[in-house]
Structure formats: C-alpha cells, structure tokens
Amino acid sequence: MPKKKTIPKKPPENTGVDFNKIKSPYRTIKTSLKSIIKDPEINHKINELVIKCNNIVIDTYMFIRLYALNLYHKKEIIPNLDSDFISYVFMTLGTRDNRGKKSTNNDLINKLDEFYKNEYQPIFNHTKFDLKGLSFTLPYIAISIETMLTTNLKEHFIKRLYRFINIFSNKYYDEKHKNNNNDYETEKKKDIFKLKKAIYENKFEEIPEKLKEWFNQHKNNILPTEFNKSIAYDCQSNPFKYIKYSFYMNEQYELFNENIREQINNKLISEKEIKELNSQILKLFQPLSLRKSCIPKYITIDTATIINLFSEKGQKGKLLQSLKENQELVWDKFFRMNKRIFRQSKDYLFNYTIQTDGIGTSLLFKHISIKDKKYGGKIKSVDNSIHYIDELSDYQLDILKTKKIVSADPGKKFLLYMMDDEGNELKYSCMQRDTESLAKRNRRIKMTNKKENKKVIDIETELSNYLSTTVNYIKFKEFIREKHKANEKTKLFYENELYRKINWRTKTYRQRSEDKFLNNIENNFGEKNDIVICIGDWSNKQGSCIKGASTMGIGLKRLVAKKYTTLLIDEYNTSKKCCNCWQDIENVKINGNSKFRLLGCKNCKINNIGSPEDEKKSILQSYSFLTRDKNSCINMLSIAKHMIYKRNRPKEFMPS
C-alpha cells in the first residue's frame, strides 16, 4: 500500500509583538525618611544601624576578596560566593549570642575562622563586630553583596576576555608573524576577530592556525574546560566559575606592567622612550567587587527589623511570632502611615518594607495580584523588553502608516537626539542632564568641603599608592591595611549627613530632569498615542571609545518605552552613509584636524544639512556637510519608512 503523501505544514504566520505593558509585581517610590517618620529619635536609631551595616559590608568585601585570592594562589577551588557563604563570613567577622538557628556547614565555618585568625585579623588587628540585633538585616545585605559580585562577573567577563585576547594575542602575532606586507594589519585584525568569534560560538576548530599556539597556551587559564551551551550563557548561569579566570587575566596585566616599570627605571633610556612605555601600562579591573566609599549606603528594613530596633524587650517575642497580624500596628506606631504616598495606587499595596540610608528612602509596593503570596513563593518574571521593528507583523506595520514616526539616536554626548520627518528636533544631552540634576553643582560642593578638610585629601592621596585591583596576595594585604587606616581617619567626615543629602538631592532632581524630557517629547512631536519612537540599538554597555562620565544606555530606552510606543532599529551603517544619497561619507578634516561630529559627502553637494554657520565652506567646496546625529536620525527614519511601506530594509543598511 503506497504511503500517504504528507502535506507540508505552512510556516506560522508572524503575529507580531505584544505592545501591552505587563505591570511589574513590585514597584518603589522614593521619598525622604524624615517625611514619613513620627519621631526624630527613630531617624537617629536608623542612622546608627545604617552606619554599622556599612562598616560590616566594607570589611566583608575585603575578607571575601582576600579569601578567594588565597585559594587562587594555592590552586584550590573557590566556592560559590552566594548569600549562604556571605552569611558565614558575617559570623566569622562578628560575634553574637548563642540563640537562634545553628549553622549547618561547620567545615566551612572552621576554614573561615582559621583564615580569619591566621591571615585577615593580623593585618590591622581587626576587632569583631557586634551582630546583636542584626539577624533580620544581615540576610538582605548578604543578598545585595551576592548580587554585586555576580553582576560584576555577568556583565563584564566577556568584555574583559576580549580585551585580554586583543592585547596579548596582538603581541604574540607581532612577535611570530610580523612582516612588511601592506595587508599585515588587516590580516591580523581579521585573525583576532575570528579567534574571538570561535570562542564565543564554541567552535574552537575554527581558530586561525596562526593563533592556535597562543590559544592553547592560555586556554585553561581563561576558559573553563566544561560549560553549558556557550561561554556567554554559562557565565550568566554560573558566574562564580569565572572568578579564577578573571584573577588570571588581571595577574597577567600586573606582570606586564611590572616589566614595563622595570624598563622605565632603567636610567639609560630617554624621556621619549619613558613616555612611550608609560602609554603601554595596562589598566587593571576589579575581579571581585569592593565597597571603597565610606558614605553609608541603603539597607533594607522590614517589620521584623523595626520590632527589633524599637519595641520593648517584653513585647519583641510576641510581635515577632505573629508578624503579618501585627505589621500594620507596628508601622503605624513609628511611621506616618496616613500619608498619601503609602496609598498612591489602587493596583499596588505597601509591602511594609523600606530601603534607606538614613536620608533618602525607597518604599516597596507589591501588586494586588500577589498580596496573598507566601514567603518563598515564585513570581512569574515580567518581560517588557523593547522589540525590533523587524519583528512586527504586516498588520502592525500597516497601523504604523497612521502614526508619526520619530527616530532617536542614542549616544554619549547627546543621550538621545530625536527627529521626525517634518524636521522637528529634540536633544537630551549629557550636560543638560548633569546640570538639571544638580550633579555638577553637588560635585563642586563635595570638592569644596574636601578642600576645607585638607587632611582627607592627603590621606586619600597616600592611599592611592596602593592598588585595590591587585591580584598579588601580599600587595592586597597591604591595601587592606592602608584602606583600614584611611577609613578610620575619614569615617566621621563621610558619615556626615551632607554627602547622603547631596546624593538624595541628585536623585530627585535627576528624576525631574527625566520627567521634563519625557514631557518635551510630547510637546515637540504630538500626542503620545499618535507617535511611535524608533530608537537605535546602540548601547554604551558594550563600551565606547569616547571618554567621559558614565551615561544612561538601556535605562533611558526603557524610560521612554514606559510612556511611548517604542521600537528598536538596527543602527548598521546609519552613521556611515549619507542621508541624501546613501553613499559613503567621511569625517571632515580641516588643517589635518577632524571637526567634531562633522561629516562630509563628496557624492552630493546640493543639500547642506546641519552645516555650522561659522565654517568657511570655501575650504572644502567638494563636500556637502552633515552633522553625525542628524544624519543618523534621517537614515533611521528612512529605514523605518522602508520597513513600513516596502516590508524590507534598504540594502545599503544591511550587513553584507
């Protein structure tokens, strides 16, 4: 009997993307602590707790780093530095009474105690902290420390790995294969790129022959022998596995720098050679996070912490036994729970938890859908990520024909440069945000205050001679000793409320600046329901050659997406092609110097977009002038229109 013919299944139709925003299970509202407490004495006690916790956290970070370095140099396995491990470190660095839950991992406790007595305590004659009354606060701190350690590894390991490859494979390539061919530099860059790509895609057989020897020499020191799916994925799921590889890379940088300094100390070399050698010194990174600032940071305070802090001895036990039933009573006794800020939304309920540094406060709210959630129960994660315009269905693209398209080019100088097809523009610059948030003014206040206390500057100048990033065990011990000395001398200076008030003021004014910008979008381009913002997918998370203050990346995109319909556009070639003719453009040079963000197109001379009035066009009569940001915005508008009306991307803006 002949087999039945199988009818091929139709490919699933593109249903597009869901623009409905799912409400987050939690949200926070910022306010000042003094505005919600009933008695100033409460503020005083909370402030003491914040300062005490800050001192514990500073020492905990240094202890963890030293312990991990000790194991690294002994070639022993570094354990997962999770919240459980951090809780044992707290027990090692402090003393408490015998009440409460007993520890289960006695082997780890004994190891940490032995390390503390033999290695850490003698560095500066460390005195153990009194952990009494912190049993409900320390678990939150342990989670925050774990988050900092894992985020450092998750966010930066791949970038650090690529930097290590770029530096040392480059030197190896020059030593082994350098020649006078004109294409040598191009070939070298291609081979190094192929090496990084092969590592990222887990295809080691595709590593170029010229770099296989170098890779095999370093492979076991920069990559694990076993990993899940890929290095990038495994780093996200098992970040602590990559601590020793981070140590190794920093160690190699340090050895390289020592070699450079030995050459500099040679009295026979010229000043020009010294300058050249100094330029080769490599900057080390923080393989494990540290808290170097003495300014007290936010801690989490819940109902149990409040009972521990403020309730009378006879009442504590009874209140702690029935927390949920008593939480409203407890909070109402010490806080102004009748204030409107505690019931701003019908969809969210106050979770009886705050985060504070003694000045500013974040109130934690939970969605009504999880109001009955039991402790430890899982909550479905919310994905409100921004979608690419390429992901839209034909129906959704047809809807965009009725909307005004606004392109937005993210960057370092202009955080967002926005433009529509009518020529309306809106800029949100880094300088504007800095000024409106009072960050610049507040930095000046901090520096003035420091200059009035010259001893602080002298102490910090002395401390700068010791590297916090070193992987050398002895040198890191020296840093811990000097850091402790500096902290003891500057602690009172930084614990002054001025610094926390400045930080609080910066946050509140920054939020005002962002709200003002969001309102300006509507004022410039029309009603929020009538516009669609197509924003470039560049992110300073990947690093930038432009130096300057840290700026918003994905955070600003998410901020815009909260209020407006927002789509991402692949920025490929938008800065390299002329917005008029889609041919190549180049940076304009006058007297050998590039003009900042000024581009020129030799293919077209008629349109003169964004040409500065003070430029003498007779100097470069062969160019049509364009500013980099406006050129990119117009190109992104063209790509968006092409996608909407022709359902594809122009070939000039597609990777070959």
Regions found by a protein language model. Give the residues of each.
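Positively charged, helix-rich recognition surfaces that bind polyanionic ligands
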Residues: 2-656
